[in-house]
From Swiss-Prot:
It comes from Bacillus subtilis (strain 168). One of its GO terms (cellular component) is cytosol. Its EC number is 2.3.1.39. One of its GO terms (molecular function) is [acyl-carrier-protein] S-malonyltransferase activity. It is found in: Cytoplasm. It catalyses: holo-[ACP] + malonyl-CoA = malonyl-[ACP] + CoA. It is an enzyme of class 2 (transferase). SUPFAM superfamilies: FabD/lysophospholipase-like (SSF52151), Probable ACP-binding domain of malonyl-CoA ACP transacylase (SSF55048). Belongs to the FabD family. Keywords: Acyltransferase, Antibiotic biosynthesis, Cytoplasm, Transferase. This is Polyketide biosynthesis malonyl CoA-acyl carrier protein transacylase PksC. PANTHER family: MALONYL-COA-ACYL CARRIER PROTEIN TRANSACYLASE, MITOCHONDRIAL. The active site is at 87, 193.
Length: 288
């Protein structure tokens, strides 16, 4: 069996999608019309460093991931058994599963990026060396009640999210702990996947009402629940994803339990491939 995984914010880089925009000219033109700017220019030239601004990053990654998927399907003629995406990448997983078309996905992602970018003064940091339980315990012990766990990317790679000053305080604390191998502040201006996104979630929920989704043709693993989407709760799950943590480790573990599973990353970079390698390695080291 094979699962295609789609990356999210953090995987963007100047030059991504090179060749794809001309190959899929009709969809590229459609994207330009929806966004009101040239997606090709944004990705290849990165004017004003816009590629690292949430409201631009999310549509750019969605388009590049989607075109990468369409090229892969056309060239290899192999459809995956499962799909999953990290945060923003989940929209590409739903697109691949035909839950909505390219245009609908881009409209959703554009709105999501806009709403998330409006909530500033937030920060995020990756803590390496501790598991989710240890991070939660440390936050509680040191009274860092305003910091949330945003992503469980791998068993010992946990991302925290909160107000900028609280994240700086938490990062300083984790750096003093002997078990921690690294604390890496993320280049974001918002406290994504945390309680600070509640307002964005509420507004996005309203926005979703106008759209129609189809039942997924391939199981799509949800970031929020680490199990396949159910059709009745698709919109609710997508809205919840904004202010809930990304259960990436649990999602991959769920897929690994299905039997022999291969994973292929579709889109720019290999961030998810590295995380999956760590999750597999940790699972192999666990006593049976």
């Amino acid at each position: 069996m094979i699962t295609y995984v789609f990356p999210g914010q953090g995987s963007q880089k100047q030059g991504m999608g090179s060749g794809l925009f001309d190959e899929f000219k009709e969809l590229t033109d459609q994207a330009d019309e929806i966004l009101g700017y040239s997606i090709k220019r944004l990705c290849l030239e990165n004017p004003y460093s816009n590629l690292n601004k949430t409201q631009f990053t999310q549509p750019a990654l969605y388009v590049v991931n989607a075109l990468s998927y369409l090229k892969k399907i056309r060239d290899e003629e192999v459809k995956p058994d499962f799909v999953a995406g990290h945060s923003l990448g989940e929209y590409n997983a739903l697109f691949a599963a035909e839950a909505f078309d390219f245009e609908t996905g881009l409209q959703l992602v554009r709105k999501r990026g806009e709403l998330m970018s409006l909530i500033s003064n937030g920060g995020m940091a990756a803590v390496m060396g501790l598991n989710e339980e240890q991070v939660a315990k440390a936050l509680k012990e040191y009274h860092l009640h305003d910091v949330d766990i945003a992503n469980v990317n791998a068993p010992y790679q946990i991302v925290i999210s909160g107000k900028k000053d609280e994240i700086e305080k938490a990062a300083s604390l984790f750096e003093t702990m002997t078990e921690v191998t690294m604390v890496l502040p993320l280049n974001v201006s918002g406290a994504f996947h945390s309680r600070y996104m509640n307002k964005a979630k509420e507004e996005f929920e309203e926005f979703l009402h106008a759209f129609y989704f189809s039942p997924p043709s391939i199981p799509v693993i949800s970031n929020v629940y680490a199990k396949p989407y159910t059709y009745e709760f698709m919109k609710q799950t997508l809205a919840d994803q904004i202010n809930h943590s990304v259960k990436w480790t649990d999602s991959i573990s769920y897929l690994m339990k299905k039997g022999h599973m291969e994973f292929e990353e579709v889109g720019p970079g290999n961030v998810l491939t590295g995380l999956i390698h760590r999750i597999k390695k940790d699972a192999e080291a666990m006593p049976r």
